[in-house]
Amino acid sequence: MFEAGLPVTTVIADRPCAALSLARAHGAVDELLDRKGYGGFGPAFDRQGYTATVTATLVAHQVDLVAMAGFGTVLGETVHSAFPARILNTHPALLPAFPGWHGVRDALEAGVEKTGCTVHLATLEMDAGPILAQEVVPVLAGDTEETLHERIKVAERALYPATIAWALGELEAGRSIYPPAPPGAQPR
């Protein structure tokens, strides 16, 4: 996102990762809100408490749009109420096909000729939100989960920043991201 020139102000991670040091290097706020302090990734996870902390952090930093990438947590109602139709997510498949944690593997196992990436609005249900943009990636003979996922990531690295830029433009013009305003619509 930084390479695309997008105005990234805050980066939150649910586990230690390179995104935090990248944020720091670009002058953005970096916050590690590690799930370990909320029960980890198992059945003891306190989704409500974790979501409240994420929401408070986003609000404190006056975030306008939330763009999740590699964030391994489905957030609860609190954040969706605070940022209605302003939480984007990306998925390595052409939703609604192959939702969930293993979209690339599932596409390969299904024997499809094409898959791709999707940018959608995040909702309380994983990978079920309204689709905003998609990019098709062909499945090649001999593809493995890793080779296919790398090609999907290339498409995603172009599609996601472009969709975020569009969404920011809509918000700046006073329009909602979803449902999208019809062409020529005036700001509300």
Label for each model-derived stretch:
Residues M1-R188:
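One-carbon transfer enzymes
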